[in-house]
Amino acid sequence: MEIKHRPTMLMILDGFGLNSNKEVNAIAKAKTPHFDEIFKSYPHTELAASGLAVGLPEGQMGNSEVGHTNIGAGRVVFQELTRISQQAKSGEILENPELAKAMNNALENGKSLHLMGLLSDGGVHSHIEHLKALLSMAKSKGLDAVYVHCFLDGRDVPPKSAQKYISELEDFMTELGLGEIATVSGRYYAMDRDNRFDRVQKAYDAIVNRKAELFDTAKIALDTAYDKGETDEFVVPCCIKTRSAEGSKSQGNICDGDSVIMFNFRPDRAREITRAIVDPNFDGFDRGAVRNNITYICMTQYDASIPNVGIAFPPQSLSNTFGEYISALGLKQLRIAETEKYAHVTFFFNGGIEEAYPGEDRILVPSPKVSTYDLQPEMSAFEVTDKVVDAIESAKYDCIILNFANADMVGHTGVMDAAIKAIEALDTCVGRISDAILKADGQILMTADHGNADEMLDENGNVMTAHSLNPVPLVHIAREPLALKDGGKLCDLAPSLLDLMGIAIPEEMTGESLIKRG
């Protein structure tokens, strides 16, 4: 006879923060009868989801990668941003053997060094201070041909802030006496993560083939893009005139034998452009003449299956994460999300492990193929909900980890009306799932990984596309709900789930259960 399981669900509403300022808050502006009923009827509290509480520098906004890593680990995980920043500040980064390998290759063979990544201080994918540390290291090594390929942000920082970062970089390079900007690309092109290779090809062609519009300076390129109505994220890849090294074939593009350091530390949006450059079997688009003998260093491990790369900061191993622990106990678990957040409920939630554990099923629902999600604010939430309800009714799973992407992905567009529609779609979905869970005598911990749709305008009334620093909710939805302790953070979620499931918390999890008993 098949065992029927009482499901415990962790529902992660990506980008759903708490903010009392209703004027800037798409969640507060939306019509949400189900959320209203949930917050009225069930015990709830708030969790810290940014800064030191999630292993980031104080005042640094949280993000999906960091959030899911902390949630799944059940402990505060020292984030790559903090780890690399500390080494950059102390000078320890100068001793990094993989970074030295890239620089020594360029120096010893008369080749160029290319530094490539997101140019901002957003701290989600990269940080400009890391780029400066690499330039300083190149100077100390005696390099003379260093090219920077700037991916413009406009998402984790204001939409038209790139000039500030370009000026900061150019001033730094002038003072250092080394480095020049070779290409400029909006992250929409250079940092796709959804196999939209028509976008990636435009960035690749500029960086490798130097096939793109040519401008005298990065400032002129940016001004021209703004005149066309492009914001930083969407700047079409272009080339910038360089003082080509004497006798070099390179005008700033990647050539055979060159060294490349990709200084993004977050993996998901660094994978496609990296594969396009290093993988001989890449077939996403026609690359033209493939570059050979590239010394390519990734700041962190983007994907264990990417060939021909070194890793400057290898992954820290996390043992006894939530998924690993309940798998070892023989329990059945489901991870489900649409494409945009699938890596977060699998790879990041499992502490950087790609493979599913025994008893761990995964469902990927494709995200809609639209250029920006304000065009379809419900995204694939209804399809995800159908599959989640089926999974609950199947009684197969002890635990379901679910992510809804809407509040984050539509929040990133900066379009208030679309974000409101996204929340209203979510409200319908959460209502359906709550009903199904209660019918199955299950329970939900409803929470979020960070804020976004809760703060759509900044203090000056400008559109805000970045994550917020606001706390996130935690609600226990059950037939007999339990009170929750205050003062928690994301790393307390795994211990709380285990507590609700009646399972001992492993010693590796230093977070604490927020469930009040008695």
Residue ranges and their predicted role:
Residues 1-518:
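Feature captures the catalytic ectodomains and active-site-proximal regions of enzymes
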